[in-house]
UniProtKB/Swiss-Prot annotation:
GO terms for cellular component: cytoplasm. PANTHER family: SERINE--TRNA LIGASE, SERYL-TRNA SYNTHETASE. It comes from the Bacteria. This is Serine--tRNA ligase. It is found in: Cytoplasm. GO terms for biological process: selenocysteine biosynthetic process; seryl-tRNA aminoacylation. Pathway: Aminoacyl-tRNA biosynthesis; selenocysteinyl-tRNA(Sec) biosynthesis; L-seryl-tRNA(Sec) from L-serine and tRNA(Sec): step 1/1. It catalyses: tRNA(Ser) + L-serine + ATP = L-seryl-tRNA(Ser) + AMP + diphosphate + H(+); tRNA(Sec) + L-serine + ATP = L-seryl-tRNA(Sec) + AMP + diphosphate + H(+). L-serine binds at T231, A232, E233, E285, S384. The keyword Nucleotide-binding applies. It comes from Chlamydia abortus (strain DSM 27085 / S26/3) (Chlamydophila abortus). Keywords: Aminoacyl-tRNA synthetase, ATP-binding, Cytoplasm, Ligase, Nucleotide-binding, Protein biosynthesis. Homodimer. The tRNA molecule binds across the dimer.
């Protein structure tokens, strides 16, 4: 959420920055409503002050046996006026709050301005693309011999976009996840296995709703609704909502393994069949709480973790700085790590590392007290470390052999009893 004080102070600058993400944004309705609210507040507070003063005068006059009927009439009139003004003020403040929470975060100055992903800038490319003496297969075709995934049986129980791992596929998936968690621990992240269901206000705090309400799976639980998390970012951010850190305790680095659930996956085309876009998947998520001065270092740390993993897995990858039109609602800056998938003949995102400044912490009311005792909102950062479906696909497609077997990356073999090859 954005700071209304900054919008008041520099409305044109704020609007210019926001329009880099959404050219249709206008701050004038917010400014007009804010001005009206401040006028109503002044009027309301003046009446409340008058009523309090009169009440004190009535109390003293009664003690002296004086007639207070005129003052009582004035108190009644003021109370009637307040009975109209106070609900109106509350309603307008609620409307302003709703308008503010629908504004995206400001993009950083170095973020390329473009309405869509065509403006993304490749800032680094690592590893040569694999060459094959045969026509490489898509992972769905490889699976016909390997039998490590099943798409038909889960479709009977859950619909399309809900694949199942089986046989050696289960072992490879868990080897990958164990390896990822070990890498997070090596880099100093605290590990978590958090809840998969969260309250409405926790989704709000991370910036997922109200703008994207309806895109998440909801579970009715008596009087309240709970939501299946789209990413562990939601719950990790929510762990410290309405809390105050001491500056000396920052930065804090968390990493969590969870299944993730997303409704929009069904929009995939035929070229994205299989594991490329699904409703449920496994992901290790990194999250950090920092001071503003620590945020850049935390960003570099997360990026280093991702590059370390992709390098050890020996997968060709690139880093892309996302344009304003391809960034998330909450991010001020995002770099995507993308691996090469021969079956798609394209790079696909396996990690997004985002700085969110104080955008989420204002919604979650997560602050810290500096060494002088002054309160500030923390900065938050998040990044996939990593999501496994496309990583799984990348391992299969980049390491496939002509006979349909797949060479297992060396760093995963200790988790697979030193198995070197997936055999059909």
């Amino acid at each position: 959420m954005l700071d209304i004080k900054l919008i008041r102070k520099a409305p044109e600058e704020c609007e210019t920055r926001l329009r880099k993400k959404d050219p249709l944004i206008s701050l004038q309705p917010i400014l007009d409503l804010d001005k009206e609210i401040r006028h109503l507040k002044t009027e309301t507070e003046a009446l409340q002050s008058q009523r309090k003063l009169l009440s004190n005068q009535i109390h003293k006059a009664k003690a002296q046996g004086e007639d207070v009927s005129s003052m009582m009439d004035n108190v009644e009139r003021i109370s009637q006026d307040l009975a109209k003004l106070e609900p109106l003020l509350e309603q307008k403040e609620s409307t302003l709050q709703d308008m503010l929470v629908r504004l995206p975060n400001y993009p950083d100055e170095d973020v390329p301005v473009c309405p869509d992903k065509t403006g993304n800038q490749v800032i680094k490319q690592v590893g040569a693309l694999p060459t094959f003496s045969f026509t490489p297969k898509h992972h769905v075709e490889l699976n016909q011999k390997l039998q490590i995934l099943d798409f038909k049986l889960p479709a009977k129980t859950s619909g399309s976009g809900w694949p199942a791992y089986k046989n050696q596929g289960v072992c490879l998936e868990w080897a990958l996840l164990t390896y990822l968690l070990n890498k997070q621990r090596e880099h100093g992240f605290q590990l978590w296995l958090p809840p998969l269901l969260v309250k409405h206000e926790i989704l709000f705090g991370s910036g997922q709703i109200p703008k994207f309400d309806g895109q998440y799976y909801r579970v009715e639980d008596g009087e309240q609704s709970l939501y299946l998390i789209p990413t562990a970012e939601v719950v990790l951010n929510g762990f410290h909502s309405q809390e105050i850190f001491s500056e000396k305790d920052l930065p804090i680095y968390y990493a969590a393994f969870t299944p993730c659930f997303r409704r929009e996956a069904g929009a995939a085309g035929a070229h994205e069949r299989g594991l490329v876009r699904v409703h449920q998947f496994h992901k290790v998520e990194m999250f950090a709480f920092t001071t503003p001065d620590q945020a850049d270092q935390a960003y570099e740390k997360m990026l280093a973790v991702v590059e370390d993993i992709l390098t050890e897995l020996q997968l060709p990858y690139r880093l892309s700085l996302l344009s304003t039109g391809d960034m998330s609602f909450t991010a001020s800056k995002t770099i995507d790590a993308e691996v090469w998938l021969p079956g798609q003949q394209s790079y696909y995102e396996v990690s997004s590392i985002s700085q969110c400044t104080d955008f989420q912490s204002r919604r979650s009311e997560t602050r810290y007290k500096d060494n002088r005792g002054k309160m500030h909102f923390v900065h938050t950062l998040n990044g996939s470390g990593l999501a496994t479906p496309r990583l799984f696909v990348a391992i299969l497609e980049n390491n496939q052999q002509e006979d349909g077997s797949v060479i297992i990356p060396e760093v995963l073999r200790p988790y697979l009893e030193n198995q070197e090859v997936l055999l059909p």
